[in-house]
Design a protein with these regions (language model features):
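Walker A (P-loop) phosphate-binding loop of P-loop NTPases
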Residues: 256
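NTP-binding/hydrolysis catalytic cores, primarily Walker-type P-loop NTPases
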Residues: 407-474
């Protein structure tokens, strides 16, 4: 593995095994800031730490900075810092918000110092809490988190504004990015499997603004979605059948609606059983499909367009790799045209997109396509898109209710009236807190999924299920 480019000497392992708090006596008490400075100076002169930092610098582009790397690196410095505290008889004390002075034990001191030195600083608890999905730092002393779907004030803040600035600079450096007053006033980055966005304080008036979206350690499964009533088993099976039938699907919603989580669960449950080849194209790897025959491709952005690999490049390349499924993490720009081209060439294409309703999605897709191919004209582009897409699903995160698949439309093109059509299949009824079943699938869709391997009896059973539910509503 690439991470093995950074080695841990045997002498360090022996040091780790020898740590024993009972053999040391306290020689001095330091504030956390004093201890941070003291530890920094000690580590700067430590031979093992110097070797490690040299290896990190030498192999910067080869080291995979994933969660495993983070954990190993954190534990390395935690052990080194704890030894530094113990061997020098240093105890760390903190003053609480109420003015109370408390001594920290060696373990707590070492962990908090390691978090400030190489970790997530005061956000470490949030990063280790699986119930927290998003972190919002408005300023150094005002932090919110999204926990179990609800926003709440975080229980910690950064030590100072300067400590927060140093933290931002450090994590961006680890991600090979920088924040400045020039071209990099707003920076998107990925680090240790998590996505982040930083906005400079010349734009964010309350101070540097940081938004973190955590990658889930244990991805939500289809059964979890059903238990939380995101959709019913009947709806999931209809989606699963049209996925198996290699149709073209856009799974859309606003930011934070859980569209990526939902499409991952659906694909993992239904595609994995099919033994079909899938290509996953993403800017930042998020889907992590469990299907064994999956090729994961990510973009490679650079300042030079000649060496960059964009989502559009990946889409075009994917057409030559004989996929059964092309799954695009999110379509937001020029890749829209290439994704639709994949649909037109007969490759099942499934992607997520931002949009509040089905027409938002169609309009955005038409606009993105026209930006890439302006000479075609809007009528031609609408015809291409209407013919290429089979379904648009919309998911929402509804206050007081939770995440719901709120609509599923079959998409087509009306050649007589020259317009895209969107026929509702299911619509979430807020008054009943249940789904209304509106229309059966068209014969064109049934024929498509049958040609792609779904037995006709199963294809027909979908419409029987829909008809039954439509009658129950009446």
């Amino acid at each position: 593995m690439a991470n093995n480019l950074i080695s841990t000497p045997q002498s360090f392992q022996a040091l780790k095994a020898s740590l024993n708090e009972s053999t040391y006596s306290t020689k001095k008490n330091l504030t956390f800031e004093e201890a941070y400075t003291f530890v920094s100076d000690e580590i700067e002169n430590d031979k093992v730490a110097k070797l490690r930092e040299t290896q990190k610098t030498t192999n910067f582009d080869k080291v995979v900075k994933d969660k495993a790397y983070y954990k190993e690196n954190f534990n390395f410095y935690y052990t080194l810092i704890k030894n530094t505290l113990l061997s020098n008889g240093v105890r760390v004390y903190r003053t609480t918000a109420e003015g109370k002075v408390t001594l920290m034990d060696f373990d707590e001191s070492a962990r908090d110092l390691a978090a400030s030195f190489v970790g997530w600083d005061c956000l470490e608890d949030a990063m280790n809490d699986n119930s927290i999905t998003d972190i919002y730092v408005i300023s150094w002393n005002k932090i919110f988190v999204e926990k179990n779907g609800h926003n709440e004030v975080y229980h910690k803040i950064f030590r100072s504004e300067s400590a927060y600035r140093n933290f931002i600079e450090r994590i961006l450096r680890e991600a090979n990015k920088q924040l400045d007053n020039g071209e990099n006033k707003i920076v998107d980055f990925e680090l240790y499997g998590n996505r982040g966005n930083v906005v400079n304080d010349i734009i964010a008036t309350k101070g540097i603004c940081l938004t973190m979206r955590k990658h889930a350690e244990d991805p939500i499964k289809l059964q979890d979605m059903l238990e939380h009533n995101l959709m019913t088993k009947e709806i999931a099976d209809i989606l699963g059948t049209v996925i198996e039938g290699e149709t073209n699907i856009i799974y859309a919603g606003i930011t934070g609606s859980g569209k990526t989580t939902a499409i991952r669960a659906l694909l993992n449950y239904y595609i994995t059983k099919l033994n079909k080849r899938a290509l996953v194209l993403e800017d930042t790897q998020e889907l992590f499909l469990s299907n064994p025959h999956t090729v994961d491709l990510t973009t490679f952005p650079t300042d030079d367009p000649r060496t960059s690999i964009t989502l559009r490049d990946l889409n075009i390349s994917a057409l030559r790799m004989k996929p059964k499924y092309i799954v695009v993490g999110e379509v937001r720009g020029a890749e829209a045209e290439a994704a639709v081209e994949g649909m037109e060439t007969g490759h099942s294409t499934i992607f997520t997109m931002h949009g509040g309703n089905v027409w938002n999605v169609i309009n955005r897709l038409v606009t993105k396509y026209l930006m890439q191919m302006p000479s075609l004209g809007i009528e031609v582009v609408e015809r291409i898109i209407g013919e290429a897409i089979n379904f648009v699903c919309i998911q929402d995160d509804i206050p007081g209710i939770g995440r719901r698949l709120t609509s599923m439309h079959e998409i087509g093109y009306d050649f007589e009236h020259h317009c895209v059509t969107a026929t509702p299949i299911i619509i979430y009824n807020f008054e009943k807190s249940d789904w209304d079943w509106k229309n059966t699938l068209s014969n064109d869709v049934l024929n498509t999924i049958t040609r792609r391997g779904v037995p006709y009896s199963r294809a027909k059973a979908i419409n029987e299920t829909i008809k039954k539910n439509m009658e129950n509503i009446k």
